[in-house]
Amino acid sequence: MPKVITLPGDGIGPEVTAAAVQVLREVAPDVTVEEHAIGGGAYDAHGEPFPTSTRDALKEADAVLLGTVGGAHDSAWNQLPRHLRPESGLLALRKALGCYANLRPVRVQPGLEHLSPLKAELARGVDILIVRELLGGIYFDQDRKIEGDTAYNTMRYTTSEVERVAKVAFWAAEQRKGRVTSVDKANVLEVSELWRRDVQALRDRDYRSIHLNHEYVDSVAMLIVADPSRYDVILTENLFGDILSDLAAVIPGSLGLMPSASLGDGAGLFEPIHGSAPDIAGQGVANPAAAIMSVGMLLRHGLERSEAANQVDRAVALALREQPTRDLGGSADTQTFTRAVLKALGSSPSVG
């Protein structure tokens, strides 16, 4: 049986993860779910934010479902040495899983166009998947230093790094509309010249059915808000992807509607992109939609169960229309929204 490791974490993480697990059990009752610790709570219990017991459990996982990590700015956790802070546990988790491709869907749900800061006619029907390279580029290269009044970082990519993340983008496009926009700055950066060359060569060799075009990152930063429907799958490197994915995250109108997946050669990591929201933790009012949509991504990309993933996506869309949560202008709390999703899936609306 497939095994999913859950890491509820801190703040509202346990609440939204519990909701997500109920949905997972409904659509995939054969999956074994096992909970482990991460983040600030893990430090309190084990003396480290990414305990050995959690690290060992990942070896048997088919997928990992993460809640949220971290506390308030003035929390005692933030006074710890950096390597013991909750966020260090998250970085160690991603490194342990070897996740090199981050998938960030940007979808405006039908009937919720009014939440977007864009005009309704621009927001309507937006459905973008941003595929970001996660382990290379300027963030990870060790050729970096501050020397007096001079500092430098190095952006470096190899063909193998480019190809492995491009394969994820092309594979995703095959499940969608068959269009990939590769984003670079090849007019001024040699590393982007390599990126463009290798992405094009891979497409021409193995993915000839995919329509590929190349755009500069500054152009995409403008067009993703001026004409977002022009995009299907966006593929880009680490730095550009970090910026573009956060820019695009405002389009749906709430971080509570933003799931994500990080994929590598082993178990994938699936998580909502919102923070731990310690100000509302324990009140039962957190929006679990992103965590539940992360289950949809887990089913699709982690367990290869596309039909179950589609069922979750449809149920969430219906629940958002019928029982919007407080951050979306409605009144539903965590349990009420979860009941609505389970009802849409044909389940008993009972929620513990």
Swiss-Prot record:
EC number assigned by the record: 1.1.1.85
UniProt superkingdom: Bacteria
UniProt subcellular location: Cytoplasm
Broad class of enzyme this protein falls into: oxidoreductase
Family statement drawn from the similarity comment of this UniProt entry: Belongs to the isocitrate and isopropylmalate dehydrogenases family. LeuB type 1 subfamily.
Function: Catalyzes the oxidation of 3-carboxy-2-hydroxy-4-methylpentanoate (3-isopropylmalate) to 3-carboxy-4-methyl-2-oxopentanoate. The product decarboxylates to 4-methyl-2 oxopentanoate.
Record text on subunit structure and interactions: Homodimer.
Name of the protein in its database record: 3-isopropylmalate dehydrogenase
Source organism of this protein record: Deinococcus radiodurans (strain ATCC 13939 / DSM 20539 / JCM 16871 / CCUG 27074 / LMG 4051 / NBRC 15346 / NCIMB 9279 / VKM B-1422 / R1)
